[in-house]
Amino acid sequence: MAAPGARSCNLSGLLPAQTSLEYALLDAVTQEEKDGLVYQYLQKVDGWEQDLLVPEFPEGLEWLNTEEPISVYKDLCGKVVILDFFTYCCINCIHLLPDLHALEHTYSDKDGLLIVGVHSAKFPNEKVLDNIRSAVLRYNITHPVVNDADASLWQELEVSCWPTLIILGPRGNMLFSLIGEGHKEKLFLYTSIALKYYKDRGQIRANKIGIKLYKDSLPPSPLLFPGKITVDHVSNRLVIADTGHHRILVVWKNGQIQYSIGGPNPGRKDGIFSESSFNSPQGVAIMNNIIYVADTENHLIRKIDLEAEMVSTVAGIGIQGTDKEGGAKGDEQPISSPWDVVFGRSGPEVQRDNILWIAMAGTHQIWALLLDCGRLPKKNELKKGTCLRFAGSGNEENRNNAYPHKAGFAQPSGLSLASEGPWSCLFVADSESSTVRTVSLKDGAVKHLVGGERDPMNLFAFGDVDGVGINARLQHPLGVTWDQKRNLLYVADSYNHKIKVVDPKTKNCTTLAGTGNASNMIGSSFTDSTFNEPGGLCIGENGQLLYVADTNNHQIKVLDLETKTVSVFPVFRSENAVVDGPCLAGKPKTLPKLPKSAPGIRLAPVAASPGQTLQFKLRLDLPSGTKLTEGASSCWFLSAEGNEWLLQGQIPSGEIESISNQPTISLQIPGDCLSLEAILSISVFLYYCSSDSSACMMKGILFSQPLQITDTQQDCIPPVELKYIF
């Protein structure tokens, strides 16, 4: 609650005074004049008889990046505080983060500034703390964040828009509000003068706030929030946008990395592979050893030449653009948060792809980059390199229209092309309207396929309902891929943690895989397996395998559309060090986890005395027509939870290099036994592929060996055979 004697604690109380200030700032010419006007404004609001105070953070709210919950009137006393009301799906909120990062780089809590993110969810999925934590990691948010799941602060302060910034003085008194994105100059002006004003009065405290970043406790991970994935149908490769590591991976179908380009830190540099950098790349498309990348947070389209091993920029200028028409040469054309890319042709008479279609999430439009001369529907001939809007007015809407420039999208985030008749369209995952839409390649007409509702202004028609057309419900879908073999569209229904399938002929939308729960389990079927905000997907060249970027699980999952099974796609370095798996170079410091679907076998008890050696012989059989994945470290390791003395504090482990010559595992019972009974766990991870390497899997099994420790010396103990057929 607000402190006693406070005035009405909502933003309307600030409006008259701040509006007068902003009109005055329009007429100010010099920086000195602007500084003076803000200083005078602060004298005015600071002299009000009653402060316009924010309420205290309610008890019981969940916090991230802090050692303990924060109090406005205890911890933040003596600070200039910026409350950032945001929701992590919102592209405008994402656009604001670089401004906040820059402000934090300029002023620290020792200078008297603290930013607090107040997460006020739009979608139900965004109310879950683990999902917010993943977003905090994805977007490198390093200030405290509170999960206001019930939007209590939002409602009490009468916030109406994402994002909204509220700047507080050192008494919790509201000073300014900024609504929407694009106010960097005002944000810095208001903050710097507020710090000066209150420092002049001795009201700023230099105490540190207990910050504890979750990212500091993350274990190393080969993939970090992979966003998008595509198949190179010519060279038997996959291209993965390893978004959280700010890099692009090119991997063979067995999972071996061929190229790692960029990372691990964000940057914006062209040049040779070892020097180039990206910033949260998303969409990828490959053709003839050329990869195009939606370099999202750099607001660029990048080109990777695998033969020359060079990265260059083909669209964007490196800062967020506001132009909603375009038409300039690509590297001179400002663009805004491109999220996905896909190749296409400017007409049926064109023999090869000459257009790169772009889901321009930042301006809620579909754009085109001309890779060669050509024309768009209802356009004159365009020069090579031209980058321009194709569909979408730029208004954030769910508006369908026969005229592409009058249609409206809401953060389009996924694209797929069906060039053949009768479809001849782009499929669009329009995330904020929770719909899938189509854009005609003949005339640009934008039509509804599934999800959402008829009111173009209602962006809150979401849910998880299988159905036809408007009766189907999605929740923030981020990816689509067209299955030409079956004439079906697969959808990454991200916030429902599902993969759905749409028949565009009937508009029927049904669940293909996932339970709706955010977790990481490989089940016995599609609907027993789980995902966590899958962000992208692509279909393999023969239509058998569906690759899914399971973003918050930091994995690529593979759905076999014929056998209806799910597996994890292994990713490993060419020097035989596994990157995506439990068996890393050297002995692991912590126990890797078996897949939840891994079967468990309890063995018959074995009696042994101190000093005796037990032997376990692996006898594993692979499915017919498969082989161990070359270069991937299939392995075993031992554990004894609750009886670590049995292993003398170690985690014995080893590799499985051949199915025909499997290892024997030896364990000597220590001389000093702390228990007469124990259970030894033998965990096994196997990476194997089909003979043609078209599908690769990681499987696991757990053998549990009960042990009875006795003082009586046992006769020679026969080896225990560990048999299993995968």
Swiss-Prot record:
Any Pfam family the entry gives: Thioredoxin_8
SMART domains xrefs? LY (SM00135)
Recite the UniProt keywords alphabetically: Cytoplasm, Repeat
Q: Does the keyword Protease apply?
A: no
Q: Where are the NHL repeats?
A: 212-254, 265-307, 335-369, 409-439, 461-505, 518-562
Please name the InterPro entries in this protein's record. 6-blade_b-propeller_TolB-like, LDLR_classB_rpt, NHL2_NHL_rpt_dom, NHL_repeat, Thioredoxin-like_fold, Thioredoxin-like_sf
Q: Where in the cell is it found?
A: Cytoplasm, Cytosol
One GO cellular component assignment for this chain's record is:
cytosol
* Top-level taxon in the UniProt lineage: Eukaryota
Per the annotation, which location comes first and is thus the protein's main one? Answer: cytoplasm
How is this protein organized at the quaternary level?
Monomer.
Purpose of the protein:
Required for normal embryonic development.
Q: What is this protein called?
A: NHL repeat-containing protein 2
Q: What organism is this sequence from?
A: Bos taurus
Q: Tell me the name of the encoding gene.
A: NHLRC2
